[in-house]
Each structure stands twice: as structure tokens, then as C-alpha cells.
Amino acid sequence: MFVPKKSKYKKVFKGRIKGNAKGGSTLSFGDYGLKAMEVGKVQSKHIETARRVISRTLKRSGKVWIRIFPDTPVSKKPADVRMGKGKGSIEFWVFKAKPGRVLFEISSDVPMHLARLALEKATAKLPMKCKFISNHN
């Protein structure tokens, strides 16, 4: 799973995700990509599941780039624990995706219809709306 090796702070505030993506909104490595259309917190398990769906659909052909990394910890207190007594322990890590951010890219040696199919299957595994983009428009 995707977990940072080290972090500047152990726990962070929840915060709000506002605005559109400033960087990472264009294709950099491949010719096909998956772009976020709305705000969402993508967990490391979502990224791994989507990656597996893409690689299985492509039958291990082509190259897949993961353009995001979960760097924000989410804490949770155990069940049946009273309020107070500090913040809970870290449960999982998330990437706070803004609209316009490219999440995955696929190389150009894969046919366009197969790349579209793979990325649309991966969209079903993510907690937000996404769209297929390509350099061949």
C-alpha cells in the first residue's frame, strides 16, 4: 500500500478542499489519462485497486503511471470510546484530489479503445467522478 516513509507532522487537521488543481492537470508521461472532475479524498486502497483493474484490463501491456500519492493521514478513535482524551491514531492515508487533477496515465502503445475501457473501469473504483482524456484530440 502507499504510505509515506516519513511525515513532517504525525497528525493533521481535517481541512477543506477548495478550488481547482494548480498543477498536475495535464498529461506528462503517457497519451491517455484519467482526470478528476470533482473533489475527493482518494485512499491508498482506492489507488491500489484502480491500478490493479487497469493492469488487468490492459493484460500487462503498456505502461501505467500513478500521478498521485496519499500524503495526508486520517485519524480515527476506536469504537465505544468516550469523547476527549486526545486525537485518535492514524487509520489510513489519503490524497486530497481537486477538480482537474490527472490521477493515472497510460502509454501510447495501447489502443485507444482499450485505454478508455481500462480507465473507465478504474473510475468505478474511485470515490469521485473522473473523465478520460487523451493527447489525440
Swiss-Prot record:
GO terms for cellular component: cytosolic large ribosomal subunit. SUPFAM superfamilies: Ribosomal protein L16p/L10e (SSF54686). The keyword tRNA-binding applies. PROSITE patterns: RIBOSOMAL_L16_1, RIBOSOMAL_L16_2. Keywords: Ribonucleoprotein, Ribosomal protein, RNA-binding, rRNA-binding, tRNA-binding. Gene3D superfamilies: Ribosomal protein L10e/L16. It holds the Pfam family Ribosomal_L16. CDD domains: Ribosomal_L16_L10e. GO terms for biological process: translation. GO terms for molecular function: rRNA binding; structural constituent of ribosome; tRNA binding. The keyword Phosphoprotein does not apply. Belongs to the universal ribosomal protein uL16 family. Part of the 50S ribosomal subunit. Binds 23S rRNA and is also seen to make contacts with the A and possibly P site tRNAs. HAMAP family: Ribosomal_uL16. This is Large ribosomal subunit protein uL16. It comes from Wolbachia pipientis subsp. Culex pipiens (strain wPip).
